[in-house]
Amino acid sequence: MSDAVDIQREWSELAQEVRKHRELYYNGEPSIPDADFDELFQRLLALEAEHPELQTPDSPTQQVGAAPEGAVDIEHLERLYSLDNVFSAEELQDWLDRTPAEAYLTELKIDGLSIDLVYRDGKLVTAATRGDGRVGEDITANARVIPDIPHELTGTDEYPVPSLVEVRGEVYMRPDEFEEINAARREDGKPTFANPRNAAAGGLRMKDPEDVKKRRLHMVCHGIGARERFQPTSQHDAYKALEAWGFPVSPYTQRVTTAKEVQERVTYWEEHRHDAYFEMDGLVIKVDDLASQRALGATSRAPRWAIAYKYPPEEVTTKLLNIEVGVGRTGRVTPFAIMEPVFVSGSTVSMATLHNQFEVKNKNVLIGDTIIIRKAGEIIPEVLGPVLDKRDGSETEWVFPENCPACGTKLAPQKEGDQDWRCPNTRSCPAQLAARLEYLASRKALDIGELGEKAAADLISSGVLEDEADLFDLDEQALLKSSVYTTQKGALNASGKKLLENLKTARQAEFWRVLVALSIRHVGPIAARALATRFGSMEVLRAASVEELADTDGVGTIIAESFKQWFEVDWHDNIVQKWTAAGVTMEEESSDKPAQTLEGITVVVTGTLENFTRDSAKEAIITRGGKASSSVSKKTNYVVVGENAGSKEQKARDLGLTILDEEGFTRLLETGEA
């Protein structure tokens, strides 16, 4: 295989990873620490710098974020850019040398969720998330219940209310309030939030504004977009105006005039990161003069007049008291550290992941060690290793258990060479079943609010459920055996009544959500949507071959094989049969499914379209039965070309492929013909 092919493959894999994790991040469900994402993104940037031909307009390095899923969209009046990052004093100095200015504004980089607010004649008319920078999710109703967001602006003689202003800010949760909310959720048996940012992101997307109030969200402004009858000359002048109109602005913002002062502010806040009343993960440096900002302009994803200095994940030491193991919904047995409570990255923690038994050995940690941990976005921090010179000889080696702590079954790797060991008692292991129940009740699946961690465990231990097959057969009589859903006098309580209502609603959930709820390995929301859209029903899906499943855009061989293998297990089949008999949705609503105009057709979209984001164009193709490809080849049927299309357009012309503009793309979607 040639070097060029290897490099192209490396770029494709990196780009796909960045897109996936960016989408999860902007939808409030990050699966890796921020530091790991930054490392992926920097690797992609470096690869494109070394091989400029790889950088195309649809590369993740040229885009701001991810369009939100499943929500009403609002187009921002002015584009909401992301920020480029630096990670060292040397990189920051390089930026300062390239971007000289009379003054800079330094402000803390709040670890929250960006929000875009539009006011006309002083009144709030819309609120949206960042989305992909051009289009965001409509969260107006939820924004109105955040106390820091004014419904109507107040003016002063110096700063009268403008006829139009677009305000940018960050929604966040205070660390102390985050701890209180997590404590209450633990008490109720509900899953705790990973960090304040996840809690804030989830809160902004809640269906009921009354529930949003309970999240105790805050907002602080960090910029302006479109405006009429308001022309500030500097960033700090704009902040004074925002404050005069009734907006909260950060008290930690400081105007400096030299590069040395900028570096001093970076050092100061790295040492005092917990002094702020919100979570922060860096310092943002902006050219203060707005005319200079306009002259410097922006790349396709970030302004040239601003940079974010990202601090490394915080590391602290604590005492390792014990090592225990947990069993997940797939049977994976994971050791975790029990530690003396320690404050790190905005919250107090007493547990940390150790991944698997081999990781414990490789990290050379002993029970009783003083250990180094870091927390970079996940709910359970990571153990980095021991402080060897703190050992006094009293430490003891940990031994991995031979049997499952939940059911006693002998543990084993799923296949030879696996580092992860599993409990093979998939159906009856109470830990696995409880985790599956909690997962199917999550927002990404059937959204059953009254079925949390504590309730799931109680349904199993009380004998109400043997497995998830009987979930939709639950009635009042069955729930009376449960302590979670009954009063002290033995009657059904409010949670029990609400659970039965939740189950009625869940029976009508969209088909793709049912597929997610089955806990088929590797089948998450994206693959489930693609399978549901293409095949339409459980009956057709089960009859499809591995090749047919794998050919579905967004699926592939690994997911296809996992899907087929799941149905080879008898009790899995029983779940589907019982859910079907209980009236659970097992096919797509015909009214929801567009005409399959693109069946068998491969389409590549490149460049910027006026009425489609990258993700919405891809979704439009997939939901009509087509394949949305990211690369041009002889197998491509159509190439849709927008502004700044780049090398893909030229390759399409070289191959003699049919090229469409946006109007032709719309016609193709409607009719299947160009």
Curated annotation (Swiss-Prot):
UniProt enzyme class: ligase
Binding site for Zn(2+): 404, 407, 423, 429
Gene Ontology biological-process annotations: DNA repair; DNA replication
Classification via Pfam families: BRCT, DNA_ligase_aden, DNA_ligase_OB, DNA_ligase_ZBD, HHH_2
UniProt xrefs under InterPro entries: BRCT_dom, BRCT_dom_sf, DisA/LigA_HHH, DNA_ligase, DNA_ligase_AS, DNA_ligase_CS, DNAligase_adenylation, DNAligase_N
Assigned keywords, A-Z: DNA damage, DNA repair, DNA replication, Ligase, Magnesium, Manganese, Metal-binding, NAD, Zinc
Catalytic reaction list: NAD(+) + (deoxyribonucleotide)n-3'-hydroxyl + 5'-phospho-(deoxyribonucleotide)m = (deoxyribonucleotide)n+m + AMP + beta-nicotinamide D-nucleotide
SMART domains reported for this sequence: BRCT, LIGANc
EC number, as in UniProt: 6.5.1.2
Source organism superkingdom: Bacteria
Cofactor(s) demanded: Mg(2+); Mn(2+)
Chain residues that bind NAD(+): 34-38, 82-83, 107, 130, 170, 286, 310
PROSITE patterns referenced in this protein's UniProt entry, alphabetically: BRCT (PS50172), DNA_LIGASE_N1 (PS01055), DNA_LIGASE_N2 (PS01056)
Annotated ranges, domain BRCT: 593-674
GO cellular component: cytosol
Listed GO MF terms: DNA ligase (NAD+) activity; metal ion binding
Keyword Nucleotide-binding: no
Active-site residues per Swiss-Prot or TrEMBL entry: 109 (n6-amp-lysine intermediate)
Homology family: Belongs to the NAD-dependent DNA ligase family. LigA subfamily.
Function comment: DNA ligase that catalyzes the formation of phosphodiester linkages between 5'-phosphoryl and 3'-hydroxyl groups in double-stranded DNA using NAD as a coenzyme and as the energy source for the reaction. It is essential for DNA replication and repair of damaged DNA.
Name of the protein in question: DNA ligase
GN (gene name): ligA
